[in-house]
Amino acid sequence: MNTSEREPLLDTTTRNRVYDTTDNPSTKIMKREKDNPKAKTTSFNQGKLNIGEETCDLYAYKETIGRQILFWLLTIVTLGFYQLLAYWVKSLFVKVRFQPTSHDECEYVMVEDIHGTQTIKEVFKAESDVGLARPTRSGKQEKVKVMRFFTYRKIKYIWYEKDQEWLNPADMDSAAPFNIYQKLTLDVIGLKEQDVIASRKIYNMNALALALTPILVILFKEVLGPFYLFQCFSVALWYSDNYAYYASVIVIITVGSAAVAVYQMRAQEKRIRNMVGDTISVIVRRDGHDITIDASEIVPMDILILPSNTFILPCDCLLMNGTVIVNEAMLTGESVPVTKASLKEADECGPEIRLSSEHNRHTLFSGTTVLQTRNYKGQPVMARVIRTGFSTLKGQLVRSIMYPKPQEKEALKDVMVFILVLGFIALIGFIYTVIEMVSRGESLKHIIIRSLDIITIVVPPALPAAMSVGIINANSRLKKKKIFCTSPTTVNVCGLINVACFDKTGTLTEDGLDFNCLKAIRKNEDGKPEFTSEFEELDPVKLSAENANLNIVVAAASCHSLTRIDGTLHGDPLELILVEKSKWIIEEAVNSDEETQDFDTVQPTVLRPPPEQATYHPENNEYSVIKQHPFNSALQRMSVIISTPSEHSAHDMMVFTKGSPEMIASLCIPDTIPEDYMEVVDEYAQRGFRLIAVASKAVHLNFAKALKTPRDIMESELEFLGLIVMENRLKDVTLSVINELSVANIRCVMVTGDNLLTAMSVARECGIIRPTKKAFLITHSKTEKDPLGRTKLFIKESVSSSENDIDTDSEVRAFDRKAVLRTATYQMAIAGPTYSVITHEYPELVDRITAMCDVYARMAPDQKAQLIGALQEIGAKVSMCGDGANDCAALKAAHAGISLSQAEASIAAPFTSNVPDIRCVPTVIKEGRCALVTSYAVSKYMAAYSLNEFLSVMLLYNDGTNISDGQFLYIDLVLITLVALFLGNTEASRKLSGIPPPRRLATSAFYFSVFGQMFFNIITQTTGYLLVRGQSWYVPNPEELDNTTTMIGTTVFFTSCCMYLGYAFVYSKGHPYRRSVFTNWLLCGIIFVIGAINMVMIFTNMGFLMNLMGFVYVPSTSMRFILLAISLAGVFLSLLYEHFFVEKVVAIHFESYLRQRRLRNGDPSLSAYEKILAAIGSSPRWFEDEINLSKSIDRKETIESKC
């Protein structure tokens, strides 16, 4: 096949929508251009880069000699400081280093994503005299002599001059019509060598190449952070001032924290690389020959020969012939084998049809496991490669893990603001010190060192390390509870969680379904059908006793898609349970060659009842399944054709169909359905049971006609046989955990792939739908449109478990674009297809629907991640708990992803629980709250300590003296380091409080606390200072003595030491997020020991201690008691101030007042989530002012709503 005739295939590469195989990519491209007028280049060097549904800004640059000289000149003049700033701020780098230019001739591009992350990439050129064939949207190839490209986040982007866009070649393949793929099934020759070479220049290798970043590079990036550099500056200053001991301690702490950070990054890289796995050898057909190559050498449009043994697919491909049974657990999270059909069985379609989810039954996805292949004798099973490398399904998953959404920068911003405030104070002290020392005639070196020393005192270099103490302790406690964290910084974020999302199956409920009962059909005295009583077994004896139709047993044993692989039945656990309950015997071909190669002959599965049931099937003890119509989610059913030959006819056959109660009822003859059918169905559904309706009909056809008769004809005019009731039990802890979270005002949300009815039932059972609230279902009509041509939406009431689940009698009204529900005393539920309609056609409703819906059913994996993103967009702090690989994208997107799995999901999530239930969620939140408030407390403690020490130094500088090195060392190393180290050792509260912790560090309560303590410091130290100076026995420091060994310095030291210890109690608040400080026996022990040492220093006159600390003996014992009393009074006032004024008045009343005022004024700093909830909660009839429409909905007095 000639390269120019290649017709490449579709790609659905996204980052936010990792598993998106539902949308037409070419439509997405056109939609983006239509919706975004800036999709084209808006200025000569600015453009847009489309990555799935994310649009990044793109800027084009080139190098010039003059700008390079300017760049290096600035670097030299600033002693490298400019280079450092340019490293932190990429835009500053490109403004000096590069010259803006057009994209047609650029040498570099800067990509800025929607989160503001900037990345500079070099543009490369590929040239060929014979021309390079690159894909186009039409599916054709166009030849160019020069191709310009760059690689961003593992994906190659090529410059298309005509379109004036950078495009991913795999995305361009996506525009090819689907009928092209169908035509390619006739080509079994494969690519020629020149085609392969040409493809490799366009597409990257089929390998998820993840080279480990060198440790030195990781370390270099880590230590170039502002905090690390400030620590280096401080340490250098201290060493130059002979303050070596504390400097060495800071060095040890800094090196340790950097080592931990490097280790965590390297461990994460290794985990991702292990997930990718090694490459394998595969067989491809090229130029008519089957050759074995490494999987990394596969290119798009290769023909892959699928082996009959189990193996993992290395790429995405379309099945050309035969059938393949695959395990798509990596895609769907369900380990149920799926049968894939070849393209030859696909319906003929026109050029307007693109690859979509409707064609997934022909698509084999990378990372999924092939269990079995079947084809005609002597012919291999072949598949056409359509996506390779990071464009595949698995590649998208890996990229979503490698390039996650960055954590919110609010906390870092608050810390920086706080440091700037301290820096301003330090600047005042710096100026004062310079003026004071110049006036005293100090040397220039002394002035510089002492002035800079003020900065290191006020802005503590150990602040980042101290703030991480709570995180380290929380991680340690989580590990003891078998919860493992790969991203420690996420722990603090967990303390802010206010929305907890859960998958259903395997997370809230047990993994599998259990058989509950059977309700068969019998004829009553009037000959009308009615339900029998419940049967706990598929027992013909008991069924016969009630004159039930025994065909329901045959249906349970035969109507399934189970497959025998290596002698063992594999398939849907539900079907395995039914076959086991029936006790029937299933016989298939026993030889592997027979299993996989005799696909061209009719080789039916044979079913036999057990010997003890033979008397109940006298006419036929052997049944043959001659055809299977697999389950189709759109049709909501599956069916089989069973040959039941008798002595009267060899053409007797039965069709058995099972599916959803609604669908099966619509296919049955009405006279065969009991009158109370819907009442019975609703009764079971609202109790959380999964119902399977079963029906049958007899047909008289020969084998050939039976195989060719259309499915819709075979599945019509059925006789209803009964209902099979399956139970998906809640896990033991689910109800208590959901209740604990709800009581703590943490919103619980179910996000599941199950149907809406079952999801609502389970949600009510576990407490997500609260019994005190009404619930409403948002649905849509596939056929009805509103006046604007959009899909029509509807709202129904779902009532309590004591009534029917869906109120079908209530008035159902259209849901208009301006409609919103008016009361906070309700909850909502929605299915994935309806949610998709809203996001695409009613974008203005997305925020309110996202804020109010608590049950999301029929959600695809990409929709789960989309929902998490929508919740984050309105300002919610979201956790996601799931157990399947289909939850990976959502786990990674959430602020706190918690995996209950050890597979792919555990790699995507920062938390993994070895206890497979949701009790880990409140545990993580409690530990997160504890770590968060500990970080706040340590921040305030370090700030109070710094300001305390700053005041001491300022007082002593005024007296021409300073704190001695021994005193500095005791304060910094013993008082502060030890206390800060154990301050975070207080455990989390056992109860999850209903009051959330402060969302930000920089609150009014924080600053009132820090500066209030500063005020008490000033009073305490100044009082002691003035008292001692006013005594008759006070002797000023002689000029010939060291100016750090003074009586006034000793006095200031004594008074400040008590304040340091007092802060440990002031900032060790327990309730409601931590346990009492007295449970932290290590901290209490440290405080007791240090307090005793302080008493010894104040009241004794030991020579070695006086010399070591630089003390001057205070001759008056009464004055020492007075100094102690002043210090204790200061501590007591600090405690009262913090407890009563800061925590009661400021944190509660003043903060509440500010919050209410911001809500009234529509402050943009408040999240949309808060505004929506506040509006609904404060005014139950708020919508009437906007819509001026209300109407009571039927007898149940449901909500008044403009629909």
Curated annotation (Swiss-Prot):
User: Which organs or tissues contain this protein?
Assistant: Expressed in the 20 intestinal cells and in the excretory cell.
EC nos: 7.2.2.-
Question: Can you say where in the cell this protein is located?
Answer: Apical cell membrane
Q: Which residues lie on this side of the membrane: Cytoplasmic?
A: 1-68, 231-242, 319-414, 473-935, 984-1007, 1068-1085, 1142-1203
Query: What keyword terms does UniProt attach to this protein?
Result: ATP-binding, Cell membrane, Magnesium, Membrane, Metal-binding, Nucleotide-binding, Phosphoprotein, Translocase, Transmembrane, Transmembrane helix
Tell me, which GO biological process terms does this entry list?
intracellular calcium ion homeostasis; polyamine transmembrane transport
Keyword match Transit peptide: no
Keyword Cell membrane: yes or no?
yes
Positions that bind Mg(2+): 883, 887
Hey, which stretches end up on the Extracellular side?
90-209, 264-297, 436-451, 957-962, 1029-1046, 1107-1120
Protein name (database record): Cation-transporting ATPase catp-5
- Family label: Belongs to the cation transport ATPase (P-type) (TC 3.A.3) family. Type V subfamily.
Q: Where are the transmembrane segments?
A: 69-89, 210-230, 243-263, 298-318, 415-435, 452-472, 936-956, 963-983, 1008-1028, 1047-1067, 1086-1106, 1121-1141
Q: Which GO terms describe its molecular function?
A: ATP binding; ATP hydrolysis activity; ATPase-coupled monoatomic cation transmembrane transporter activity; metal ion binding; P-type ion transporter activity; polyamine transmembrane transporter activity
- Organism superkingdom: Eukaryota
Without the gene, what phenotype results? Answer: Disrupts the polyamine uptake and/or transport of the polyamine conjugate Ant-4,4 and norspermidine, a toxic structural analog of the polyamine spermidine. Intracellular levels of the natural polyamines spermidine and putrescine are as wild-type. Double knockout with either odc-1 or smd-1 (two enzymes involved in polyamine synthesis) results in a reduced brood size, delayed postembryonic development and reduced intracellular levels of spermidine.
Provide the membrane topology annotation.
Answer: Multi-pass membrane protein
Instruction: Please name the NCBIfam families in this protein's record.
Output: ATPase_P-type, P-ATPase-V
